[in-house]
Amino acid sequence: MKTSAVLFFVTLFLVVSVVAGCAPAGQSQATAAPVVTTKTYADLTLCYPQLGAESDWRTANTASIKETAEKLGIKQLVFSDAQQKQENQIAAVRACIAQKVDVIALPPVVEDGWDAALTEAKNAGIPVIIVDRSVSADPSLYAAHIGSNMVLEGERAAAEFNKMLPNGGAVLELSGTTGSGAAVGRAKGFRNKLNPNIKILDSQTGNFTRAEAVPVMQAFLKKYKPGQDFQGVFIHNDDMGIGAIEALKAAGVNPGDLKIVSVDGTRGGFQAMVDGWFQADVECNPLLGPQVFDMALKLVNGGAVDRETLTNETVYYPDKATDLLPTRQY
């Protein structure tokens, strides 16, 4: 009986020991599991190699990025100005890769020539967001694009000329930086939708700047008579539009003599509508800061993002320009 009792208690001890040895295993595993930490804006380092400061639009875009970074309290914004030179942008991207930033948000000055730099960023494990303009590189080399539908902007401009010149005519085109996504897209959209009875008489680049648009418009006016040889001008951004107005004024052209459609929707563009120079201004919103930082934080935390995020935009007209001008943020 004693032997049986001893065997019973020994057996019971062993069973309890085995159970006790197994039961905490799950608890130990849970305790030892790596803790997943979610990064916040305070942990985020973002590189923004801005393409330049060529226009009011670009100035507003820079302000949106900087102001949003400050408001969100991000760890570091690595900002640079490439002065509209791709080689400067590429150098800035490579410097950010060497610095091991979390995300690169790139507003490319032109579409082509980005494969090498984007490949380097991808190999370094740094996601790249293409901002504003587009690139021709393999989409697998960057995480997403945030910006405007430049082709649609050109199509909207064409629709305005189709309405204003129902019997046909001829227009001039002041285009943006050669090879840039904005210039390529707007030119393509414009040609997609322009009625066949409206001829594009001539097209020259003003490089998206007010200063360069003046001599281009002056050269146009030496070759073609306003109202006779051409009835309208499609201008790829408001800064060039303001430069064109300067040349038109000097040549004795008055507001309303020509049909002018611009792109951007800046304060300068609204003033040109108020003054009777622009008949329409196709919106292109530069205030992309909140969207850029929201997407950047999702990317560093492994979240899914949309490959293409297009801003919601419209077309503005002179009849509302006076009322809306004081409310414009850029």
Residue ranges, per PLM feature:
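Hydrophobic alpha-helical segments within soluble ligand-binding/sensing domains
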Residues: 39-41, 89, 145-171, 184, ...
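Hydrophobic alpha-helical
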Residues: 106-122, 190, 202, 207-271
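Flexible loop/hinge segments that line or gate small-molecule binding clefts
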Residues: 112-152, 170, 266-274, 325-326
